[in-house]
Amino acid sequence: MRKCADMKYHFAAEVRIYPSSQQKHIIAVNDGASRFVYNRMTANDRELHSLKKAASLCPAYKGKIAYLEQVRSSKRELVNTIPFLKEKDVDSLAVDNAIKNHNRAWERFREVPGTGIPGFHKKSYAQSYQTNAHYKKGAESWEEGNVHFVRRSAGEQVPHFISLPILGAIRFRCSGKVLAMLTSHKEDTRVGTITIRRDNCGDYYASLQLSSDIPFTDPFPRTGSCVGIDMNLTNLYTDSDGNVIPNPKYGRGMKKKLAKAQRKLSRMKEAAVRDNRSLNEASNYQKQRLRTAVLQRKVSRSREDYLQVQTKRLVESQDLIVSEDLKVKNMLRNHKLAYSIADVSWGSFFILLRQKAVLYGKEFMKVPAKDTTQTCSGCGYVMKGEEKIPLGTEEWTCPVCGIHHLRDYNSARNVLQRGLAVKALQI
């Protein structure tokens, strides 16, 4: 069977799993092993990074550098220094993926300007690790590997169990659409990386990375329409057709309730520390921690569901979607707007929009955001100096052609015009 990277179409499916007590123990063991390996490798590389800076001044460091590079480059050397990685419950592929994630983080640090030095992974209530599916030579279906559905009887039409590496058969549940896709896409489909995780509320999930040469979904029909969108904080976005999509502000709506729950959690933590009790043994603290986590998850899920609906609706109705290339990370540094920007979740919106455009055969592109607000979409005049439109002004009139503009609608029209200009140059 071909590698995932060599296949044309990619899809991710997440199912909720219900592990037994023994399987929960195995998940916890592999989460700990992955975190330990990642942190050990990070400690080695941080020390290497410091020693190499001073090696020219102190030749004595060269021996230590050679030893650290040897440990870093050899998985066997690493496993030999950490005996518990040889235990039967430890998935060797979880160790491989931890090393791969570590190497990827350091490559990003070295190659991407502005990326900070990789830090350590902290132990938390949430758990996760990654493993991979294996196939025999000549396998044609993803169910011929070590990840496959398990049917407890010959007449069972809908599978309720899935077999995962090390964990074995485990009960699962997912939406009907995801299950139909998994059961229909067997031939010429490969499962790549599998992420097993437990969230802060104690629920377990398995995410399957699927690759195939056959599309996972049918493309949406062409509409011949194109649209530019202007992102803002009052609304989610305004498009070049004049449509305004509201911003439900889920985080702000839950802010008071969440703050109250977090204050209560903080007081319980202080009481436990004062009484010299472990937080794991403080039952009231754990109950309140769970209540707080449920509130946070509710906000996150509500926001994600809304973005899923809006991005799919946009991709379904348009052949080309053009947006400003916003530097969300830089904008979050503005402490006055950071909470509102995080609440509207522009970054997730763009990621979902790009994924759905690829999945359904449409096109999404970004154009520079410079002066989209200050430019008249009618005549192209750019407001400069004292003429510049301040942030709070929602309407303005062009001093050259006299057209009266709504700020966001005008910006969306400029975004679309720039996108069409780029498309014309590509033809």
Q: For each predicted feature, which ranges?
A:
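Nucleic-acid substrate recognition interfaces
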Residues: 1-427
